[in-house]
């Protein structure tokens, strides 16, 4: 989620793409999802969690939203998510993918992978997808650099 939010910011020229692995859509939604998972009334308690974050943490969970950043992202983005992720729902990556404004994007769902485990679950497939996705991007960056010398 952090790299998705950073992708909407002004970044150095050497940042040529984003690998978003099992990112959530918003801090608010992931907090509420976890609350529901532990059988707490999320809609009732979330305002208190938000207040606590503002008072004790110095931040507003409603202010951080990867999906909103995706609407401004122009960098190439490859989204990975495991279909067995029981922490961040796979649908959140689908929503982030749909919201992404980049013309060069791809969503890879890894069968049987839990949260953050796409790479260990399918190393070969992960490498292949990364190579296929970023090779054209990196090739154009290399040719741009050689033309400027």
Functional labels for PLM-detected ranges:
Residues 72-74, 79-81, 85:
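Short beta-strand/loop motif that positions the catalytic acidic residue
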Residues 66, 75, 89-98:
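Short alpha-helix in the alpha/beta-hydrolase fold that links the catalytic acid
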Residues 84-88, 116-117:
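Acidic catalytic loop of the alpha/beta-hydrolase fold
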Residues 135-149:
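Alpha/beta-hydrolase-fold serine-hydrolase catalytic core, especially in secreted/extracellular enzymes
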Residues 113-127:
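Catalytic histidine-centered segment of alpha/beta-hydrolase-like enzymes
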Residues 5-60, 68:
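Hydrolase active-site cap/lid region
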Residues 98-117:
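Catalytic histidine neighborhood in serine/cysteine hydrolases
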């Amino acid at each position: 989620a952090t790299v998705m939010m950073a992708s909407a910011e002004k970044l150095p020229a050497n940042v040529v793409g984003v690998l978003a692995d099992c990112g959530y859509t918003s801090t608010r939604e992931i907090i509420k999802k976890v609350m529901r998972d532990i059988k707490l009334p999320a809609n009732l308690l979330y305002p208190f969690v938000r207040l606590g974050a503002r008072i004790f943490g110095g931040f507003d969970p409603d202010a951080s939203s990867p999906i909103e950043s995706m609407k401004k992202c122009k960098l190439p983005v490859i989204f990975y998510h495991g279909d067995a992720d029981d922490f961040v729902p796979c649908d959140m990556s689908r929503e982030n993918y749909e919201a992404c404004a980049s013309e060069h994007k791809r969503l890879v769902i890894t069968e049987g992978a839990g949260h953050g485990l796409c790479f260990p679950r399918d190393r070969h497939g992960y490498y292949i997808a990364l190579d296929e996705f970023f090779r054209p991007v990196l090739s154009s960056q290399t040719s741009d650099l050689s033309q400027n010398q």
